[in-house]
Amino acid sequence: STLSVSAGTGTFLDEGNFETISFPKSAVPDRADFGVRVCGDSMEPVYHDGQIAWIQECSELSPGEVGIFMYDGDGYIKMYDEQEPREADRYDFTDSDGTLHMQSVLISYNKKYEPKLVSPLVRFSIVGRVLN
């Protein structure tokens, strides 16, 4: 099945919004669980509007990996990174044990798009790793 994810400002991604497309087995990476259609230009020149990105489901990524994310109800394809939160935001990134957590950052390859700093106050999840 294919779902659209934004390579831009965000696209709704849910399990009820899909189509089935046939591909030769050789076109699909072995570990792919599903494919999503890229929508937009923020990941150019690597990922293009309309291209299928093949996804391995996972809930964690390392900085520098490209993934599919749900953030505030929208789906994104971006490069994952982490940074120490700004001083003003540290309270929101500190758990009840006093441990300071890193802030997730979603980065576009196309430099006309600013990095998206993930707020701990908004729903965020890693859906999977892009394999192609």
Regions found by a protein language model. Name each.
Residues 26-132:
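Acidic/glycine-rich C-terminal interaction modules and beta/coil loop segments
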